[in-house]
Amino acid sequence: MVVNNFDELKALPREQVAGKIVLYNEIYDHHKAISGQAGAAYGEAVVYRASGAVAASQMGAVGTLVRSAGDGAYRLPHTGWSSDAPIPAGAVSAEDAGLIARLAAQGKVRIHLTLTTHRGPDTTGYNVVADLKGSEHPEQVVIVSGHLDSWDLGTGAIDDGAGVVVAMETAELLRRLNLHPKRTLRVIAWMNEEMSASGRDAYVKDHSAEVANHVAAIESDLGAEHPLGFHAKISEAAQKQLTPVQTVLAWFGANLIQLVPSSPETDIETLADKGVPALGIWQNGLTYFTYHHTPADTLDKIVPQELRENAACMAVMGYALADMTEPLQK
């Protein structure tokens, strides 16, 4: 049973779905992605991986397949997290989803699924945290961050080794330039973003008494392609405060700030929900979702010059937030 979206599934009689394997054939919006809105394109596609199995099981399906959430290329299926459901669920490459859809249009298709994925027992992991102490207000904190874990298929170079390196290099650039911001710059490599964001939750729990002193949180978790600027969950007043920073970022074309209604990145989401201004580096995303969550997420996908641009982008914003006279208005 092939459907393109949830509305098509819900429009079907239950008896037509019962006992079938449902394929969600939602096509990733390549044109939206190459226009600088790769994250939005991914968000439209990934809901079927995240929630498709639950929706199909409620209609009596015995299994689900989802067209991989990302740009189709090289017949690579993309892995990722899915909501718990009482039926098997798997991802297929974009090319194979198209093949199944074409065959289904011609008649009955029989599929045999052999799924070997499993979730092992929980183990102990750790966030990695380092502080560059503020010169005047060390109790006030600006976070720069990426996440340490990755899916098992690739090496995690773009998701999110690049983000960790960019955050580390932010502190290193300030040290090398002998800059001493007024507030503490805190570098965090978050643990377990991919499965449940438990590193984020542990940090907020451990620092619950200090959340009010968090001036801002930045994360890089969209690879290391050319930065366009930032997606930001901040007030309009805070956006005006950042106008001088945008002037500096314009030097290498990274001066856009797009306000968003919710946290731009997973690991800083809880802080954002508690009122901490949250920013995520906005890259052009031309190829990120081609390799994301696949065996092709390897170091050769990183362009050194673009990685340096991302480090400069985070360093400029991180230093500005840590050193400005008044913190961002919440």
Please describe what each predicted stretch is.
Residues 1-88, 155, 256-257:
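Extracellular/luminal Protease-associated
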Residues 1-3, 35-53, 85-90, 116-118, ...:
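Second-shell loop/turn segments in exported
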Residues 2, 21-25, 62-67, 89-91, ...:
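Structural recognition of the beta-strand scaffold that forms the well-ordered cores
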Residues 2-14, 79-157, 169-182, 205:
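Soluble metallo-hydrolase cores and metallopeptidase-like ectodomains found primarily
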Residues 17-22, 59-64, 108-109, 138-142, ...:
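Loop/turn elements at helix/coil->beta-strand transitions in domains of secreted/extracellular proteins
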Residues 57-62, 66-69, 101-105, 172-179, ...:
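Sec-exported extracytoplasmic/periplasmic mature domains
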Residues 87, 97-98, 104, 137-139, ...:
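Metal-dependent peptidase/peptidase-like ectodomains
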Residues 89, 172, 176, 183-186, ...:
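His/Asp/Glu-rich mid-to-C-terminal helical/loop segments that flank catalytic regions of hydrolases
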